[in-house]
Amino acid sequence: GDASSASSFAVDVAGFFQTEEISYNDFNGRWRAGFNLQNLGPKMSYDNTQSSTNFLPSNMKLGGGFDFILDDYNKVALNLEVSKLLVPTPQDPDLNGDGTITTAERNENNQNYDNIGWVEGVFQSFSDAPGGFSEELKEVTYSAGAEYLYQDSFSLRMGYFHENPDKGARQFFSLGAGFRYSAIKVDVSYLFSTSKVKNPLENTLRFSLTFNFGDQYDEY
């Protein structure tokens, strides 16, 4: 087909809060919480007509965690995150109630969807699932993770991600480890799927190498 350009813009809005270290009976601890609203912006426009616009993949993430600071050398971190797409669900109702959705009705439904503004769409995404509130909950993905950290230099990690089978069925565990020396950090992780649906990243081993310039680290 003919090449065409598209235009839009997007912003992210995020916040993070972490408490000071709190003393408990047998350990110290630290709470944290955060949010991230991603890709907020006008619909992607491929020309100047309303029918050639698409919603950006706006997304909301809410997370929290707690650090078990066992002593000067050992720390365990637990984290939980929920995520939801902030895009309205396309609707295709039977407008005249005769039991049949005609081409004219479908065109009207599509036009009604195209007329939804991006701000309206963000709010509408919380209440427009055809199956009601129970289906809205199915649109939420859940992630949980744990990390053991020794001397802020060596870490072991594990995590789990869950997406409802009706909404994509991505479900997988991950295992990982990390090592930091001076300004160099090496991380490795392995992902394996627990879903019947194939994941392109399942059974993959991933490495990352990070150089941190400007910060000072203790060397062990």
What positions do the PLM features span?
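Outer-membrane beta-barrel porins/channels
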Residues: G1-Y220
